[in-house]
Amino acid sequence: MPWLQVRLAISPEQAETYEDALLEVGAVSVTFMDAEDQPIFEPDLNTTPLWSHTHLLALFEADTQPEAVFAHLQLLTGHDLPEHQAEVIEDQDWERSWMDNFQPMRFGQRLWIVPSWHEAPEKDAVNLLLDPGLAFGTGTHPTTALCLEWLDGQQLEGTQVLDFGCGSGILAIAALLLGAREAVGTDIDVQALEASRDNAQRNGIADDLFALYLPEHMPAMQADVLVANILAGPLVSLAPQLSGLVRPGGLLALSGILAEQGEEVAAAYAADFELDPIVVRDGWVRISGRRR
């Protein structure tokens, strides 16, 4: 059966207001979509991932009049509507259509991220199986891509890798598949640790090779390699702690940092690390270096 699809171009601040209003006027489903190809690999768990430019899609029964929907939305919100449109769409196999949007992606020279329903493009490559979901977006978010490419470029054989703020575990799992001896992941959210364990098992990684801890339970350690794809504020405030978690001569890679925040974060680590040039991509940066 056909459906009426209504699309609104909104900001994150408008999301809740328009979601509630659409449901009140009879939408049978409401979906948030990225308007500018800014997929999120590792959003905060228990949150709805929103982008700086978001499309809100709502489906209505086919006989719904779009003019009536827009009039009611304006009345309910008390504001002029943002950019909007309506169209009639035909029913389809939504699950298959959704799956077709996700293709294997390559990071660096060896590493691929491969959805479970796809054949690995290169059988002899390092293939990390990860299905789309909250921990996997429609493309390559610059921060996660920068970290994955950095890991791909390191000699990780025999190393211990710490993934600080592990989220889905994607960085630690990639490090293990690239040759790390063992990995440690830590996150403030128990659900993130559970997701990391599930993803590790899907990739054939034994539990004893990938230890997972809440921060307060993490043992004292100094890793050979530390990766942290979190936010600039915590990276600055935690700089003494993170620096102490890397052994002398060990490696560090940080992301989740906007370009304008790069110098501030780098300055917080400059005393303890010989830093590489900052790498910038699409307004995000990666900071890496070697412990003095």
Swiss-Prot record:
HAMAP family membership: Methyltr_PrmA
Enzyme class: transferase
InterPro entries assigned to the protein according to its UniProt record, in alphabetical order: Ribosomal_L11_MeTrfase_PrmA, Ribosomal_PrmA_MeTrfase, SAM-dependent_MTases_sf
GO CC, one annotated term: cytosol
Keyword tags: Cytoplasm, Methyltransferase, S-adenosyl-L-methionine, Transferase
Protein family (similarity comment): Belongs to the methyltransferase superfamily. PrmA family.
GO MF entries: protein-lysine N-methyltransferase activity
Catalyzed reactions per annotation: L-lysyl-[protein] + 3 S-adenosyl-L-methionine = N(6),N(6),N(6)-trimethyl-L-lysyl-[protein] + 3 S-adenosyl-L-homocysteine + 3 H(+)
Protein name: Ribosomal protein L11 methyltransferase
Location in the cell: Cytoplasm
Record's keyword annotation contains Ribonucleoprotein: no
GO term, biological process aspect, one: methylation
Gene3D superfamilies listed in its UniProt record: Vaccinia Virus protein VP39
Pfam families: PrmA
Predominant location: cytoplasm
Organism the protein comes from: Pseudomonas entomophila (strain L48)
EC nos: 2.1.1.-
Record-linked NCBIfam families: prmA (TIGR00406)
Functional note: Methylates ribosomal protein L11.
Binding site for S-adenosyl-L-methionine: 144, 165, 187, 229
